[in-house]
A protein has these predicted regions:
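Glycine-rich ATP-binding loop(s) of histidine-kinase-like ATPases
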Residues: 102
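Conserved N-terminal entry element of GNAT/NAT acetyltransferase domains
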Residues: 2-25, 163
Length: 163
């Protein structure tokens, strides 16, 4: 994967941002961002506080170039991670946006970037295990629900985006 950065406008109004691969030195800061973003959702807060081990960004994903950050004004405001699936498709394994920059297009740009990377690797679909609180976001990004199941945090959605 090329380490080149892409500059993209958010929502046509926001300043330019950079989407780039994460670096190992950012791991702790990204996990802290994940926690802040996760605690915004009151429906997940109690379960997350009972299971702090859920906040984990494997270093292997970062060193493999599978974690992407969005920088705005030099600050990281969101990140995503992808993993290869056994069926040849790609899983969106993480998607977190700073609470103060949510609903500004950061998450959508990360999904679009991950879809582009997955397509370049030969995947035909991008999959995600979605939280019901994020259902409308993923549907707006083009995902469809292909199943439902229970997780240790409550209900989960299996979703797929054709590439």
């Amino acid at each position: 994967m090329a380490a080149a950065c892409r500059r993209v406008p958010l929502n046509g109004y926001s300043p330019l941002v950079i989407i780039r691969p994460a670096i190992p030195a950012e791991r702790d800061a990204l996990e802290a961002l994940q926690l802040r973003a996760s605690l915004v959702n009151e429906g997940d807060r109690e379960a997350l506080l009972r299971h702090p081990d859920a906040i984990d960004l494997p270093m292997e994903q970062i060193t493999a170039g599978a974690v992407f950050v969005v920088e705005q004004h030099g600050a990281v405001v969101g990140f995503s991670a992808i993993v290869a699936r056994e069926d040849g498709d790609t899983e969106l394994d993480a998607l977190f946006v700073e609470p103060g920059t949510q609903r500004q297009g950061v998450g959508k740009r990360l999904v679009e970037h991950c879809a582009k990377v997955a397509r370049s690797k030969g995947s035909t679909c991008l999959h995600v295990v979605g939280n019901p609180h994020a259902e409308q976001f993923y549907l707006a990004c083009g995902f469809s629900i292909i199943g439902r199941f229970d997780t240790r945090f409550g209900p989960g959605l299996l979703m797929r985006l054709p590439l």
